[in-house]
């Protein structure tokens, strides 16, 4: 028997909450110790485990600020959720290798979260609307 929708939502919302507070340790606490963390297109490729995943979040939190995630849709399976969200905030650094110049930024994300039996996120796969980011960076 898989997790309930409410339990999956609570874990994802907790994960996004730690991200909004730039809390690397909090984010990692929502992930299983052997997590597969796959940000599609990230230069170093998929990471496995907390130690390999930490650098992504450290870079992300220095490159983006004042972030808010708005959930648009969620689709559920027994032990997974597909989450479509909209991220809005500022880009003081170089998010995803693109100069941010501390301007406002918004882009859609598609997450596939898979859960371990204990409720930890055992796989996080993220697809980012890079075209939207590039378009916003090329104007202004």
Can you name each region flagged by the protein language model?
Residues 46, 91-92, 130-134:
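A short local loop/turn or secondary-structure capping micro-motif enriched for an aromatic residue
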